[in-house]
């Protein structure tokens, strides 16, 4: 088996592949990678996998006919063989897995136990029948020393398959999300999946999401691949920021508000503090810039970390006040980190007659913005979807940045989606 996976949450079981007889490959709730079969843990790594911004390449290579026990099952992560295990108990010689038999097989579920579905992104899923292949058949190291996928050119065997997850249908055929493109037509039936679950966020182009490990007060729940946020009224001024910290370049994203939010825009992660780590802070404290709702008014505002006080930054040629934002509105953000400007719009129109492409009527960022800023959402009972180019809500029009991303409204010229392809070019 070879696949790529990006975790969205710790403390859960994330099943990659399973079959009957309690045989599966998964990230366990203790953040270790586990291979289970023959009624036991074959491998349980000492290494912990906790990075919600990273894609992991997992290869499990099996040949139980090997006389040397240590050669029967091999586990690789990002091209390197795992050898440090909490549990290492190789299967018996000639052990017959259920994976290649006519029994139920599950990608992204544990077929014998409900509730172990992964919270994350899955891509480039190969199952090779009859061969024990190492990672170099599926990946390679690029010029920057990063392990990346490459095209597999070998055969799949009778029961093998390749899932590219490029289709959007919900049936077990060539148009379905579970389409097998190996040529074997071993199609899988999508369950509880829809077209919106197919995303551009892949191992070849990693998109920003909200960062689940950000400390917060109150109740905050992330879902839809960490692009939807639901905040409790007990969350006060607490929220989540993105997995990308931006220090240069020009960037565009959108937020669809479902239930009124308290604040949305940007923060400087290096200034982020809360009262669990700093008793002098009365709740949350950080520099931010963006939309702030207070006393039924919506304004553009910046916050100074010192004492948690607020201050209005300037809007060149315009006003800090903006129209009230309602449910289902889509808020547009264009960030110019090269010049220290932020532009905000609603439903296709930038406020204060701003023009990000020409650099006019901008909102000025905090003076220390060069420390790096991240898109950010605060709640106090609000709900929203954030779209960095990988939307988890329906897009009626479809606009890219010229090459990547999918947005409701046109991306200003010279601005780009928050993805690794664009960061490499312009970040």
Give the role of each language-model region.
Residues 39-43, 96-122:
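Extracellular glycan-interaction patches encoded by glycine-rich segments
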Residues 5-14, 233-296:
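Secretory/extracellular carbohydrate-interaction modules
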Residues 1-34, 66-69, 131, 136, ...:
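Extracellular glycan-recognition modules
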